[in-house]
Design a protein with these regions (language model features):
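Glycine/small-residue-rich loop that forms an oxyanion/phosphate-binding "nest" at active or ligand-binding sites
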Residues: 77-108
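Charged helix-capping and loop-helix junction motifs
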Residues: 129-135
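Single conserved hydrophobic/aromatic residue that forms the stacking wall/gate
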Residues: 157-166
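Hydrophobic faces of well-ordered beta-strands that scaffold small-molecule active sites
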Residues: 11-15, 39-41, 67-71, 118, ...
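Active-site-adjacent beta->alpha loops and helix N-cap segments on the catalytic face
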Residues: 48-59, 130
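Acidic (Asp/Glu)-rich catalytic clusters
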Residues: 31-34, 56-66
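Active-site beta-loop-alpha junctions enriched in small/polar residues
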Residues: 16-20, 42-46, 72-76, 121, ...
Length: 166
């Protein structure tokens, strides 16, 4: 008798949420939070605010959705899509400050931040610049070694430093 072993695979459906701004409505966030597994929550620098973050965290908790920080350059006018030339210490502060804002809100709901996915120009620049990608990976690891760093897998500059840091 021939037995076939079927491999199981888990797929995580992930979405950028809480991006309320003049560029974007968060009208459908509650509906999306019913179908996603993890949410990248805007931390107020490119979009969103503490009230919006709190709403997303509350609904995420209710639906069992993992909460992630979605840090960006402080660029609400351009929705975080304007490239900026910042020093290493400025980049670290940018990531840490936004993570801490969301973590404080998550904690108030009995939750914690499980992952980080950079937004917009910050993420795009890291895809092209191994030094920036390494700074991001190390900063995220320094925040909490158990936090997942979501990176586009097709970008070598982001995946290599992530493997080296972990």
């Amino acid at each position: 008798m021939l037995y076939l072993q079927i491999m199981s695979m888990e797929i995580n459906i992930n979405c950028d949420l809480g991006e309320k701004s003049k560029h974007h409505s968060n009208k459908y966030d509650p509906d999306l939070l019913e179908i996603v597994n993890s949410a990248n929550v805007a931390c107020g620098y490119h979009a969103g605010d503490e009230q919006t973050m709190s709403q997303v965290v509350k609904i995420s908790k209710k639906n069992g959705v993992s909460i992630g920080a979605h840090p960006s350059f402080k660029d609400p006018e351009n929705f975080g899509r304007e490239r900026m030339d910042l020093s290493e210490s400025e980049i670290k502060k940018l990531i840490i400050d936004q993570y801490e804002i969301l973590q404080k809100i998550a904690s108030s709901h009995g939750e914690s931040v499980s992952h980080v996915k950079p937004h917009g120009a910050l993420n795009n620049m890291a895809c092209e610049d191994i030094e920036l990608a390494t700074i991001l990976a190390k900063t995220i690891k320094d925040i909490n070694k158990d936090i997942i760093y979501l990176v586009p897998v097709s970008y070598t500059h982001l995946t290599l430093p992530t493997r080296d840091v972990v």
